[in-house]
Amino acid sequence: MAAPWVSLRLVAPMWNGTRGIHRLGGAVVPEGNQKKERKMLQFLNNHFYDVEALRGYLLQREMSKVHLKNRSFTWLEEQHGPYSAGAFFILKQGGAVKFRDKEWIRPDKYGHFSPEFWNFREVPVEAVDASDCEINYEGLDNLLLLKELQSLSLQRCPHVDDWCLSRLYPLADSLQELSLAGCPRVSERGLACLHHLQNLRRLDISDLPAVSNPGLTQILVEEMLPNCQVVGVDWAEGLKLGPEERPQDTASPVPA
């Protein structure tokens, strides 16, 4: 942000022999007011600088936290196998996992969860609910360990973007259900990357603000994945003509 000195349009002071500042308009600013102006300008300058510095610091701190949450758990994979390592990553993010023939495992409101999943070293994870989690591109390394994953929910994940979707192809043989509802950074380009997932049976693409034409996008996705039920979008959404695009009837009215 530019310092407020310019916006106030100060001009160079000129001395006219009196105590004060003589401006170009001819008015003399008393010395007391001059000091007040300088203090105010200094305060504004310091204030704006501090806000920018604080904003940058908070942003950097938040990104560091996201990076830490998405670090690789290779050491866990080596000790406990890919299923337990992948499950631990999701549970630490606040998500839930379901091992084959087991009940869902979810963290409580304090983030604590049962350690029993460490005993499921040889049991595949068949479903993951990562809704509202801070998974990003790097964190997918831990999720892609789950080669038998059948159901994946990434609803409202703020860091899931088009690049993330381009990495899901290793799950093509197993993944049958995928929800991307409410992901703010997913656009048509990312959805086009899902053509690898030909075993999908259900895909939720509702509430994607980065998709410019939801109706047309759903039609194209349905053609790309003919065996998949695409839900969440009214097929006519984005295809209806607005008032300014509708043809005007210029014919003369028929007399009664």
From Swiss-Prot:
Residues carrying Phosphoserine: 252
Source superkingdom: Eukaryota
Keywords of this entry: Mitochondrion, Phosphoprotein
SUPFAM superfamilies linked to this entry: RNI-like
Keyword set includes Cell wall biogenesis/degradation: no
GO biological process: mitochondrial respiratory chain complex I assembly
Record localization: Mitochondrion
Gene Ontology CC: one annotated term: mitochondrion
Free-text function comment from the UniProt entry: Required for the assembly of the mitochondrial NADH:ubiquinone oxidoreductase complex (complex I). Involved in the assembly of the distal region of complex I.
Protein name: Distal membrane-arm assembly complex protein 2
